[in-house]
Amino acid sequence: MRVTILYLAAGNSRRFGENKLLYPLDGKAVYRHLLDRLAQIAGRHENWELLVVTQYERILEELAPLVKAGRLQTVFSPDSEKGISYTIRAGIEAAEKQNADACACFAADQPYLKEETAERFLESMEMQKAPLGCVF
């Protein structure tokens, strides 16, 4: 089963006052904490891919070396400013083009989500052949 992990890094941070995804936390941007864990997870599973969906050029630029290394892919989603449904849609459309059997959505503003929790969720999705799962 081909699972695409959709990493939703496109929020508007209206209440936060600035882009919370880029806010420094424990030595790196908030969005990088869970992303780095998900990249490790995807690297251990042959049929799992990591796809970052964002409306931010800076995130695309920062992730370019990881894209080049084949660790993840990115999708630019300018419509994400309209809401999370546009971000999810952009991710699912990209996953469909890659012939994914399932999509698992993770929000980038969850820096403390444990690697083992995320991996168990994904393994459970795969075992149940669930076409869509979300961790928000």
Residue ranges and their predicted role:
Residues R2-A108, Y112-F136:
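Nucleotide and nucleotide-moiety/phosphate-recognizing core
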